[in-house]
Amino acid sequence: MNEIITARGSLLIAGVTIDGATVDIAVDEKGTIAAIGKDAKKTIDADIVIDGSDRIAVPGLVNTHTHAAMSLLRGYADDMILQDWLSQKIWPLEAHLTGDDVYAGTRFACLEMIKSGTVAFNDMYFFMDRAAAAVDDMGMRATLAYGFIDLGMEEKREAEIKATETLVAHVRSLDNPRIRVAVGPHSVYTVSPEGLRWCAEYAAEQEIGIHVHLSETEKEVVDCVARFGKRPAYLLDDCGCLTPRTVAAHCCWLDEAECRLLAERGVTASHNPASNMKLAVNRAMPYHWLKAAGANVSLGTDGCSSNNNLDLMEEMKFAALLQKFAWNSPTLLPAGEAIEMATAAGARALGTGPGTLTVGAPADIVLLDARAVCNTPLFHADSNAVYACNGGAVMTVLCQGRVLMHEREVPGEEEIVREAAAAARSLVDRAQDSS
């Protein structure tokens, strides 16, 4: 195994490129960036030295909407209408999930994210105690939420409340600064107003975040207005779910007033362009309205079953192109803003630091291959990162100063892939046997 990955202590990335300049990055033993510049090496006696020549340093990427264990469902069901896809394929299969499946799937998802430059993610799913174990093993950051779905039934709501409280207690017992917890009301169409209010009150009481799907489809909006007399964002607001700790995924069918409301409440909107296009939700997130209102807009992949990968490098390109095409504006969401969505905006949403390569920030650092075909010629690094490269250009990944991947080597990769493949096959077999 690569000894740079197994070593611990202070670290120096020597001769790396940042914004066109060749510098060193010094990382102290706490995993914090101690210095950046030509004299950075003088600030520490480095235990680990990484050769940064022919490498471009960028902040670690932050994926603000995932269902990580759904990596086991990659390619299981495609090219379907969203509600049919969920009700006929995804939900029936998920009924057979076990904690071991979620561990294997989440560990596999972490591997894929690391290999494409992601250091932190915002996850909503089930058996999240096992997801936490996978995140811990892989060395990433994550905010984990149990997917709260009560379907308007009081008995089910009580069970969801208990499951949420159990996860919060479990994550706090881990005392792991890389792993945080949130409340996860799935959506306005799967959670009753009573359930939404409980989620909001509990999140406020515990001082934790809220992770929710919002206005993904036109049907969600139409049904909400028909049932409650108001659009989904206003229903969430009435229930107390729109706060500065809230990440709202999708936001495709927001109107301009709802965009202003999210900005006023300090909500982060998570753009998931690949999933939205694949599921044909028929409208791109109104990024221009959200930005004009001052909202924080971040980037997510959604789950592997609707993307079908977790490559946030690729997602940046999808975001930029979709916005330009859908809103007929070639200047909308330029490359620099796409990178900011995938880094600093996501870090703000999850509270993982500034999401920048600056002194005092957590050493969440990605090194891209400057010699890769996608980076040749290298006129503008931001442009290449967004429009030309994908996760294959990622060579080295650090999270809080710990090397998770070096020269594309991740410890235990073959075993992780093998176990995920076996878990996926077993899950499908169990579902078929029961039908």
PLM feature segments, named:
Residues 1-23, 27-34, 343-435:
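Active-site microenvironment of metallo-dependent hydrolases
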Residues 16, 31, 54, 65, ...:
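Divalent metal-coordination and catalytic microenvironments
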Residues 72-104, 111, 138-153, 158, ...:
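Active-site gating loops and adjacent loop-to-helix segments of metal-dependent hydrolytic enzymes
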Residues 74-140, 163-174, 422-432:
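Alpha-helical scaffold segments that flank or form the walls of functional sites
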Residues 130-252, 257-259:
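Metal-coordinating catalytic core of metallo-dependent amide/deamination hydrolases
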Residues 218-230, 258-263, 280-290, 307-324, ...:
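Histidine/acidic-residue-rich catalytic or RNA/ligand-binding cores of hydrolases
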Residues 238-245, 287-372, 386-390, 398:
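His/Asp/Glu-enriched, well-ordered alpha-helical/loop segment
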